[in-house]
Amino acid sequence: MNENYQPRKPFTPQQAKTIVEQLFIQAERLDDTALGQITRSLLSVDEIRPQTVHIVFDRAFAGALRHAFRKEPLKSTEQIISLPDILSIGPVESLHTDEGIKNRFCWLQEHLRGDIQEQENEFRCAVQDIKRIPPHLPIILWAGNNAAEQTGLRFATYLLSGRPNEISELNTTKAFESLYRTTKHSEEIHILRSSELSPEQLLELYAHYEPWKWNPARRIAIEQEGKSLMYDGSYLRTWQYDELWSSDEDRHDSFIMECARQLQSEYPGEYYNVLRLIGQVYGELEQYTGDTWIEYRVKELIRHGELASKGDLGDWRKYEIGVIEDHRTIPNIDRDGF
């Protein structure tokens, strides 16, 4: 698919009028060179307009897709809207409203590190971009098999409720496995996030993998799931059995503690830098939450006495942690950073 350039659509009456007016002006001046330039530029008016809108749910993935579409004609015909937030974590209740957006980013500001204000601004811009998509343009939603992107897919679909646009879904996990899985490597080929794909792979996927064009029943079902999310008071979502689930915040705490004990065995009776734990959990966790969520849960485990810490909890480069099996294992328990 998408290997052949789509033909130019007919001019609107206003465009035709503009062409005629400018051609007459140039003809009167007997400027053949300018006349040719004007004609060519006006005939390309429709060609530079987007013909497909792609909505993605990962900042890094958006960058890779833009790189894949950097050459003509795709550069002009494909519009990319990025909803750059990890929607598997934090509140999403009433996220389609101004108050819901404020509540989400206030919570993120209070619990996670990062430039939350910039994230909020980008999120608001993306929501407005989705709402302003022209009704005649087809939309492709890109998402992998993870809660962050699947939550975004449902939220975007809910924002598009009642719109006449044709919607298709391109599941990057399934597409990648379909195109690249071989008998020899059948168990090794797996991606968790769309951003794991290179621009070259994305271009190949777009050329050779047919997105799933939703029928009315599928669209209504996803819209309803998106609507349900707007009433969901949980702060963590997971993807299991091809479905999105609301989960308790502490769902991954036992796994974090398992990793913490493994690392503690390398430093018996000592502290170690928290980034070692965050990195190990991030690399092994089968759900995508982002590293700042993992640090948030580590701090909660410190707060509840499962882990000890020393140093500045405001900077993850400057504090260390240790496992507390009882209060005598690691000395100098420090909870003053809260």
What are these regions (language model features)?
Residues G63-A68, V92-E93, E149-T157, L179-T183:
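A short acidic (Asp/Glu
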Residues E110-F155:
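Long, hydrophobic/aromatic-enriched structural stretches that serve as scaffold segments
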Residues S186-P268, Y272:
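A conserved mid-domain beta-alpha-beta active-site/ligand-binding segment of alpha/beta enzyme cores
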Residues Y267-E284:
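Short acidic, hydrophobic short linear motifs in intrinsically disordered regions
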Residues Q287-R303:
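Short amphipathic alpha-helical interaction segments
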Residues E300-F338:
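C-terminal engagement modules used by replication, chromatin/transcription, nuclear envelope/ESCRT
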Residues F24-I116:
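A structured, charge-rich N-terminal accessory region that forms the first stable segment of a protein
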Residues P73-T77, F155-E169:
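A short alpha->loop->secondary-structure connector
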